[in-house]
Amino acid sequence: MLSSKTFQILFLVYSSLLIFLGRQLDRGITNFDGAYYAIKAREIFSSDSLWVATWMGTTRFFDNPPLPFWLTGVVYKVFGVSGYAAVFSSAIFGVLIVYLTYSLCNYLYKDNWTSFLAAFVLLFPGLFLDSSRRAMLDITLAFFVTASMYCLIKGLENRKFYLLYGLMAGCAVLTKSLLGFFPIVIGFVFMFWYGGLRNIFDFRFLAGVALSIIVGCSWYLVNWMMFGDLFIDRHFKTPHMQLIPGENFSNNTLYIFGYLKDMLRNYWPWFPVTVAGVFLFAKSSFKEKDYRSMFLFLWVSIPFVIMSTSRNQTLRYLFMIFPAFGIITAHTLAGWLKDTQKERALPWMVGIIMTTVLVVNVTPIQVKVSLEQNNAELRNLAPFVHINTKPSETIFNYGYTNWNPTQVLGFYSERLLEGPVKDAETLIQKLEENPEGTWLSPVSKFKELEKNFPEELYLIYGNQKFAYFTSKKNRENITYNFFNTKVPIVR
C-alpha cells in the first residue's frame, strides 16, 4: 500500500496540510515581514485602488505587487483578520508545491518511490516547512514558479499548456516583481537548448510568453500611470533590486558564494547528494542532451547564479528552486540505492512525516520551526492600545527601534508606533506638551522612568515585556471598558 501512487499523494497532501496549518490558531504573527504583509493584505480592499498596496493607510511603499494581498484579503473575508488567516494562503500554496513536486517527478521519471522522496526532501530539513507556516511571499512565489515550470515541460507534449505556463509566470511577477520572470528566462534558454529556434518560435510558446508579460506587467503599468517617476524610483531603484552592487563586489568578491555557504549550513543531510546530483544532471544535459536533465539543471542553476550576485542573499528567496532540488536529489539517490534499500526506507519516511504531524498538532513542544508563540505579550496589549487611542492617533515610542515592534503592533491594534525617543528628558518634555499621548516602552525602561520621575506617569497596561503608559494628568481619560467596543482579533 505504501508504494501506491494514490496513497502517497493523499498522504502527502493531508500530512502537509496538517503540518502547515497545525497549531496556527493561537500562534500569532511574526515581526517584521509577516506582520508587514498582513497589514497590506488587510488594507488592499479598502484602498482607493486594488492595484495600490498601502501600509497603515499610506502609499509611500511600492515594494510589493498586489496578488498575494488580494489572496490573503479574500481569506480575511472568510475567516476574519487574524494571524491564522494571514498564514493560510502560504500554507495552502505550500501543500500545492508538495503535490506539484511529487507529480512533476512522477511525470518525468515514472517512479513512485523517487517522487515520494522528492516531496520528502522538500519538506525536510525544515526550511520550506517553516516558511509555509509564515505569512510571507516566498512560498506563494515558489508555487507560481513551480506551476509555471510544470506547465512548460508539459507543453512539450501538449502545447496548450504553454498558455497556462505564461499565466503562472505572470502571476509570479504579480507576486514578487522581477523574481517572477525567472520561468520566462529559463523557458527561453531551455527551449533553445532543447529544440533550437524552432521551439522558441512556436506560436503557442510565444503566446504564453506574451500572456506572462501582459499579466505580470499590468501592475507596473497601472502604478506608473498613477504615480509616474515616484513609482519607478521607489520600486526599481531601491537597494534590494540591485544586482552586483559595487561596494560589495569591490570590498569582498567572495560574497557571491553567500548562497552556497547558506546551503552548506542549512541543507543537511541532502547537501552532498544535491551537489553531486546537480553535477550529474549537468553532465547528462551537455553530453546526453537529456531534456529532463536540461530542464531541471536550468531551473536550479539560472536563479541560483543570478541571485548569488544580488545585494540581499536570503535563502528563502531560492525556495522557487527547492522543488527542482528535491527531484534532483531524489533521482540521484534512487540511482545509488538497491530496490531492497528503497523498500526499507519508505516506511521510515512515512513514519517521520507522521511523527512531525503529531509533534505539530498534539504536543506543546516549542521549537524555532514556527512552533513558538509569537508576540503573545503584544497581542495581549493590543486591545488596550486600540481602545485608548483614536484611529488616526499614533503611539509614542521610548526604547524601541523604528520597525520593532511597529509592524506587529500595527497589525493587532491598528495603530502606528512613532519613531523612537532616545532619552528620558525628551520624553518628559513631550509628555508635558501632550499629556494625552500614550507611550510604549520596555518594562526596564519604564521602571527607570518611574524611579527618576515619580508621580509623573500612569501605567495603563503592563506585562513581562511591555509597559503602555501615559501622563498622570491623562488618567481620567483612560478606559478599560470594552462593552460595545469592537476590538481587533488578537489570535
Regions found by a protein language model. Give the residues of each.
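Transmembrane-helix signature of polytopic, membrane-embedded enzymes
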Residues: K5-V13, T101-F124
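Extracytosolic helix-loop segments that constitute the early lumenal/periplasmic catalytic or substrate-binding loops
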Residues: L18-L21, Y36-R60, L67-W70, V74, ...
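Transmembrane-lumen/periplasm boundary regions of multi-pass, lipid-linked membrane glycan transferases
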Residues: A38, E43, C171, G180-R292, ...
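Short acidic/glycine- and proline-prone juxtamembrane loop motifs at membrane-interface regions
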Residues: V87, D130-T140
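Transmembrane-helix motifs of polytopic, lipid-linked glycan transferases
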Residues: F88-Y109, A147
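Membrane-interface transmembrane helices that cradle and orient dolichyl/undecaprenyl
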Residues: N106-Y109, S148-L164, S284, L333
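Short hydrophobic alpha-helices at membrane interfaces in multi-pass membrane enzymes
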Residues: W113-A118, K154-G170, V300
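Short periplasmic/luminal acceptor-recognition loop of GT-C membrane glycosyltransferases, typified by
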Residues: N361-E476, K486-I489
